[in-house]
Amino acid sequence: WPFLLSDKVYRFNQPFTEKESNEKYLISLSFSQEKGLSVPAGFVSGQNIYNLFSELTIGFHDSIPFRDLPIPFACVSANMIDGKEVVMDKGRLPLAMRARMAIPGVFAPVTIDRMVLVDGGISNNFPVDVAKNMGAEITIGVDLSTGLKDEKGLDNIMGIVDQLTAFMGMKSYENNKAMVDLYMNPDLKGFTAASFTAEAIDTMIQRGERVARANWDKIMALKKQIGL
């Protein structure tokens, strides 16, 4: 995961000149005659994670309606040009997935149809309304947020970005939370979106199972309601 969430290239894939420069310099910046020296749009361009998404979605790279997938799918991004929410329910699946995770300042935005798209969390981070508009009669929402951070959680760029995202999407979040049929919020304090160690993953799975078991009667009631 550290490799996927970076712009690194495996050393054996690098030409000699690139290997040499990587050993000498800590950072690299773009330079062109038109723009001169330019600062990147994100700390990470996201090519490695996009390559992973492309590999995992082989067979669904053409422009398709996502509701025709084996499990209907949609995701939410935000257009940085006008600030509007963009529900991505068609197009190239790996590109939509990459746009959805373009955390501002961390991952570079994705440009699609003249829109500059970033993580939809700033506009709609709990999109129950999107699921209902797609035809979902019963919605079960698993909220992975851990609430607003205190001063200890705001000592790094990721914490600050998370807090800004939470503030910007607060109204939409509360509205969607109110309309979900079953709300579950596992305790993920102490973990971040980059917690990919085996120990962290096992702990988060256990906490998720604990919340599901605590809501077992409600889950069974919903199952009975839809006739299963």
Model-identified regions with their sequence ranges:
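Patatin-like phospholipase
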Residues: 1-228
